[in-house]
């Protein structure tokens, strides 16, 4: 769905992608986040690993090994970082790669950590090389080297740090440098959620928001949420609005379907931009293969937006393929638009 708000200056934004949230939306997101691993739905493999490693670190009285969380946006990386700090019973300091412009920015954060604290760096793949250089000895030896003074009088001073845990999050693990990636002892890939898992999340969120929601209504929201909890919660809030105005506040499957259809989110969870991309590949390029730059030009989006935001779900659901010769629409994409797939597909 394309919606417009004052925050974006009237610029359309998609309900089914990850966009900057208003302060009110951020407060709602925080309220809906699980607070403990026991409440965290989905990501069974990552959750089980973290349970074991956290318990072992607590028994030994040590800082948890450094953790790298990667996967598409909205799957719970930030939520897991907060849960890790709560499970360890320590403080969490949060920042992001683009914010840490200078080595001094990182040094200030590191020197203010308490023993075993968690430092969470979102978008860690966007750290500058000079900041990464400071981070390496901090991760390995709990020490940093900083320069004091200028010119001939400048000297390097080594500062000891308390043991701490770095939790790094990224949507683009391939952009991490090898030296940085190798310093994470725990690496967890977050996968898209199943409709059943998202149904549980939607029902939990509905309870917190005091929304009257049946199982079928919850499933209808879940199956259109692109395997992403953040999108599920966002769609739930819009469906709640629709139900309060048009359906006495009760969300049934029919009400959810009507609301989401009005929002241009189809039963497969595809919105206007998804369909625009697939239609371009099918109609303008005969189903492909077609290069990324040509697709971007055809739909008026940047290549980064296509690769990071639009494509992952389409590829994961089998609508699109990346091949050495370019993007290709699959038989599922052809049939979704009511076309007969060519024999070569």
UniProtKB/Swiss-Prot annotation:
Residues 4-193 are annotated as: Large ATPase domain (RuvB-L). InterPro entries: AAA+_ATPase, AAA_lid_4, DNA_helicase_Holl-junc_RuvB, P-loop_NTPase, RuvB-like_N, RuvB_C, WH-like_DNA-bd_sf, WH_DNA-bd_sf. The RuvA-RuvB-RuvC complex processes Holliday junction (HJ) DNA during genetic recombination and DNA repair, while the RuvA-RuvB complex plays an important role in the rescue of blocked DNA replication forks via replication fork reversal (RFR). RuvA specifically binds to HJ cruciform DNA, conferring on it an open structure. The RuvB hexamer acts as an ATP-dependent pump, pulling dsDNA into and through the RuvAB complex. RuvB forms 2 homohexamers on either side of HJ DNA bound by 1 or 2 RuvA tetramers; 4 subunits per hexamer contact DNA at a time. Homohexamer. Forms an RuvA(8)-RuvB(12)-Holliday junction (HJ) complex. HJ DNA is sandwiched between 2 RuvA tetramers; dsDNA enters through RuvA and exits via RuvB. An RuvB hexamer assembles on each DNA strand where it exits the tetramer. Each RuvB hexamer is contacted by two RuvA subunits (via domain III) on 2 adjacent RuvB subunits; this complex drives branch migration. In the full resolvosome a probable DNA-RuvA(4)-RuvB(12)-RuvC(2) complex forms which resolves the HJ. Belongs to the RuvB family. Its main location: cytoplasm. Mg(2+) binds at residue 78. It comes from Laribacter hongkongensis (strain HLHK9). HAMAP family: DNA_HJ_migration_RuvB. This is Holliday junction branch migration complex subunit RuvB. Keywords: ATP-binding, Cytoplasm, DNA damage, DNA recombination, DNA repair, DNA-binding, Hydrolase, Nucleotide-binding. Has 3 domains, the large (RuvB-L) and small ATPase (RuvB-S) domains and the C-terminal head (RuvB-H) domain. The head domain binds DNA, while the ATPase domains jointly bind ATP, ADP or are empty depending on the state of the subunit in the translocation cycle. During a single DNA translocation step the structure of each domain remains the same, but their relative positions change. GO terms for molecular function: ATP binding; ATP hydrolysis activity; four-way junction DNA binding; four-way junction helicase activity. Residues 267-345 are annotated as: Head domain (RuvB-H). Its EC number is 3.6.4.-.
